[in-house]
Amino acid sequence: MKIIKYSPLFLASSIYLTGCSDSETQANQVNEQLTKSADEISKPVVYQVFTRLFGNTQTVNVPWGTKERNGVGKFADFNDAALQGIKDLGTTHVWYTGVLHHALVGDYSQYGIKQDDPDVVKGRAGSPYAIKDYYDVNPDLAVNPERRLVEFSALIERTHQHGMKVVIDIVPNHVARNYHSIARPAGVKDFGEQDDTSKEYARDNNFYYVPGQSFQVPSSEQYQVLGGDAHPLADGLFNESPAKWTGNGARAAKPDINDWYETVKVNYGVKPDGSYDFPTLPASFATKDARAHYEFWQDKNLPNSWYKFRDIALFWLDKGVDGFRYDMAEMVPVEFWSFLNSAIKMQNPNAFLLAEVYNPKMYRGYIHQGKMDYLYDKVGFYDTLKAIMQNKQAASTIFDAQQQVADIEQHMLHFLENHDEQRIASPDFAGNALWGKPAMVVSTLISRSPSLLYFGQDVGEDGSENAGFGTPTRTSIFDYIGVPAHQAWMNNGQFDGANLTPEQASLQKYYKAIMALNNLPAVVGGDMHALNVQGSDRVVAFSRSLGRQVILVLSNFSEQQQTITINLNSQTTANIGANSALHDLLETHSGVLVSNNDQGASFTLTLNALSSAVLTNKVNNEQ
């Protein structure tokens, strides 16, 4: 699927043209965009799947259970039916989470893989963000672990055959405490292999050290390794001398139990006092393209870790991976991202680059200087939408959150669930998956932002299983577990939804209908205006417009029916047509009559509990 990214200049001209009859050439260009086929126009839709959980059919779900007991999914489970089901949600990119070889409690020594110490592994299956070999994939995911890279390559090919791109994680901020690559190409030095461990910091060291002190495993009365199950390596000890700084920056030889103690911090030339040991990027580069950034770094002498991660990214691009999701990107200097991402874009200009950044003050720097394509819109949009769903804020507050990033909205990824966040259906979030219906409508249609769906979200997965490490409400990323609602859709590998309840099947159908609206030009590249709502503070209402196409979106964030009146200004009235009958592209609110008034026009509509309407007139929709 071709993703069309409208430039700000194009967007401005298309909106301006609604009132410019003398700009015939420009008007024709806009209307040409409006008549493109659905295959040519779309916003990116990312489907995040936790790879080891996706194909698991076991339903035992014993806390801290082994893969033999609780089961584990494989690359091979993503068969044609599974991939078509993912594609049917409008997916353009599949983010396969947990692909790279990370620390885990399991014995693959017959394949030359050293066992991991449970004292520095979270859960039994292990965190996907404690990577122990950047040039290898998780042996748990292979039917034949000896051919694990071949099996992943086959998955890449199958995904491409279904018209979707492949995204995997890269975690530049930290690596597993027991990092050791057995799959690295000839001549590639391992992380830390050439470090001067007598120094806390040296520019070309890959890690930071605590000279003269050995690492001590953190302890807590509330935590037992593997839930107390016996293991020959679970002895409260891990041999690391001198100790390294922990992944979240903790500098003690014995980190706290709440630190990221299973990982170690990577050194990018940031001194312990926070100053930089590398060239800074001139401010003018905020407006320069990837090639200019790439050329800037070519004659610079840079810290060793920069080159290591560049080589890792290019290695996976060569394998057919189409992009990366960067974990905790804000903990790594923006200059490094300029260096890495520009190198990636020189190899694949269409590479998809998504970063986890939570500090709004850093958003624009990581987009413009760091050359990120997309950032999480969690702090702001997600947090506000969640508060609205929990009835803690008025529905209209979503517009304040959206306005904060209006200038960069096309770079801000919208989501309601991911591996870090609570499931909508969990009691600590909304307690009912149906709350995802109005929220997904607003999240998807309010702006040019791309969308993310987490596996199981569309069938109401509630994350209630006690997998071992951590607590329910989030589907476990640390242990082997079955995902019940998702398994109902999976139907033992048929991926036909035969075991879904009527409610689950209806919810999935609704998600598909929402995501199909991403093909509307007004949604892909149109302007957004909040609409005046009378009669309820639980309804979000806005218009999206591009050229002559206008849609009106109304979503009810209440478990009670809401009757509202929407007042339209003269511009919207002119585009949508006074005294016209609107029809609903999503639900069944057809025959809504628009009536003239002194300010323009208005209409009255009754929305059922947690329902939405996406209104337009037929002529408008066809143009």
PLM regions and their residue ranges:
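Carbohydrate-interacting/catalytic domains
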Residues: 1-7, 12, 18-50, 54-56, ...
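N-terminal structural segment of carbohydrate-active enzymes
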Residues: 24-165, 173-175, 179-184, 188, ...
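Active-site-proximal helices and loops of the catalytic beta/alpha 8
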Residues: 30-31, 156, 174, 186-189, ...
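Short, well-ordered coil/turn segments that N-cap beta-strands
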Residues: 43, 90-92, 162-164, 320-322, ...
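Hydrophobic faces of well-ordered beta-strands that scaffold small-molecule active sites
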Residues: 45-47, 94-96, 166-168, 324, ...
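Short, solvent-exposed turn/loop segments enriched in Gly/Ser/Thr/Pro and often Arg
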Residues: 50-53, 95-106, 169-179, 327-333, ...
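Short, acidic/polar
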Residues: 72-86, 301-317, 436-440
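Long, low-complexity, polar/charged, intrinsically disordered or flexibly structured peripheral segments
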Residues: 226-303, 314
